[in-house]
């Protein structure tokens, strides 16, 4: 059966864009969801994850305003800090998070700032840089050596303020598990041992696995003295050892990471593929031009088995860089309308972001918009035809 929430394929630019815009204009005329025309349309005060700054701020919002006459007042920052602003009384009408669980836990669950959310796009973690000196070639599979050298400076977001921070932590933990877990019989979450997922990831090719395992142990055991097959060595080296010696730097929001790279104060940044595209950063790619970090660790999968593997680790970090201990989960972007500050045009904005025009601009920025968005909570009637219940195979931790 076809995956009901698979990402939409990236669209080409040109005639398709013209047709898309024309189609949307016609849609407004013949039944597209709208509200009654008013003499003065209030701006939609909107918070969005910083990683959406280009897709929304530069592309979607201007087009939306051209089509509707409704202005969009934007604030871009870390989703966790944005949720705290809502709790403190900031009057956002629309809230868009880079982590559906953060939106649910901070604004829906026992807090009642919102009564629903729609999950509409995925994303992937990547290793990025600007200085060619630090390029990681597609032919080089052992990327973890480059980013963990003592002299290498790595930048990431602070996990307590921004989802990309704890998603970077999850990615490093998953990589450690993937490269050490062939014989790991521990059943951490679910019904299968870690070894089940590792062997699937390597297509039961033990020789291929051993290439990675040997490189991992030669590096972390041989160079740094970690125990053999220590699955947390990669995570520990970046987020504890290098942080303590000043070669891992944390920032408050992912849109600031490029500043570290362009200023030369960091050699690599752990951030989203979409950020690499929007900010003109180089990123680690495989030989076919895709993300060099495989789906098993980049948190971009909407496949049941891979998502089950994500759950084998959690998001917890060291005391200075920690948000909690929820299980690992895909990177899902979600959107809601804040209950106390509902703008009459807020639902229309949500409608257009999760359908054709919004999907187009998200795809241009290397997000993975879902062909079938899904919802949690009491979604408004105007949006119900666009969404489905969460697929049963997705771990609840990916959206709750």
UniProtKB/Swiss-Prot annotation:
It comes from Thermoplasma acidophilum (strain ATCC 25905 / DSM 1728 / JCM 9062 / NBRC 15155 / AMRC-C165). InterPro entries: ModA/WtpA. CDD domains: PBP2_ModA_WtpA (cd13540). GO terms for molecular function: molybdate ion binding. Residues 1-31 form the signal peptide. It holds the Pfam family SBP_bac_11. This is Uncharacterized solute-binding protein Ta1052. GO terms for biological process: molybdate ion transport. Belongs to the bacterial solute-binding protein 1 family. WtpA subfamily. Keywords: Signal. PANTHER family: MOLYBDATE-BINDING PERIPLASMIC PROTEIN (PTHR30632), MOLYBDATE_TUNGSTATE-BINDING PROTEIN WTPA (PTHR30632:SF16).
């Amino acid at each position: 059966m076809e995956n009901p929430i698979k990402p939409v394929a990236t669209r080409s630019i040109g005639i398709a864009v013209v047709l898309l815009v024309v189609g949307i204009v016609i849609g407004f005329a013949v039944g597209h969801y709208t509200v009654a025309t008013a003499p003065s349309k209030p701006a939609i005060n909107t918070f969005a994850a910083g990683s959406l700054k280009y897709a929304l701020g530069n592309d979607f919002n201007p087009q939306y305003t051209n089509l509707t006459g409704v202005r969009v007042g934007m604030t871009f920052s870390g989703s966790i800090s944005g949720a705290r602003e809502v709790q403190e009384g900031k009057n956002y009408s629309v809230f868009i998070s880079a982590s559906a669980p953060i939106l649910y836990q901070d604004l829906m669950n026992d807090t009642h700032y919102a009564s629903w959310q729609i999950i509409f796009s995925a994303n992937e973690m990547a290793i990025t840089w600007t200085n060619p000196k630090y390029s990681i070639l597609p032919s080089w599979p052992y990327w973890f050596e480059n980013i963990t050298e003592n002299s290498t400076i790595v930048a990431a977001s602070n996990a307590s303020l921004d989802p990309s921070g704890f998603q970077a932590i999850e990615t490093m933990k998953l990589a450690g598990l993937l490269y050490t877990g062939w014989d790991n019989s521990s059943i951490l979450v679910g019904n299968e041992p870690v070894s089940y997922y590792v062997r699937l990831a390597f297509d039961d090719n033990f020789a291929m696995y051993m290439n990675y395992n040997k490189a991992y142990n030669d590096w972390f055991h041989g160079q740094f003295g970690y125990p053999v097959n220590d699955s947390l060595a990669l995570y520990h080296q970046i987020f504890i050892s290098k942080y303590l010696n000043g070669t891992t730097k944390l920032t408050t929001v992912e849109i600031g990471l490029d500043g570290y790279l362009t200023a030369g104060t960091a050699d690599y940044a752990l951030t989203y593929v979409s950020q690499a595209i929007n900010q003109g950063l180089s990123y680690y790619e495989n030989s076919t031009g895709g993300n060099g970090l495989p789906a098993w660790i980049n948190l971009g999968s909407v496949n049941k088995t891979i998502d089950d593997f994500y759950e084998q680790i959690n998001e917890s970090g060291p005391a200075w860089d920690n948000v909690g201990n929820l299980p690992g989960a895909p990177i899902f972007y979600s959107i809601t309308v804040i209950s106390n500050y509902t703008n009459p045009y807020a639902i229309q904005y949500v409608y257009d972001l999760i359908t054709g025009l919004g999907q187009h601009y998200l795809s241009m920025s290397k997000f993975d918009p879902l062909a079938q968005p899904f919802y949690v909570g009491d979604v408004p009637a105007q949006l119900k035809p666009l969404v489905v219940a969460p697929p049963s195979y997705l771990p609840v931790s990916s959206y709750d």
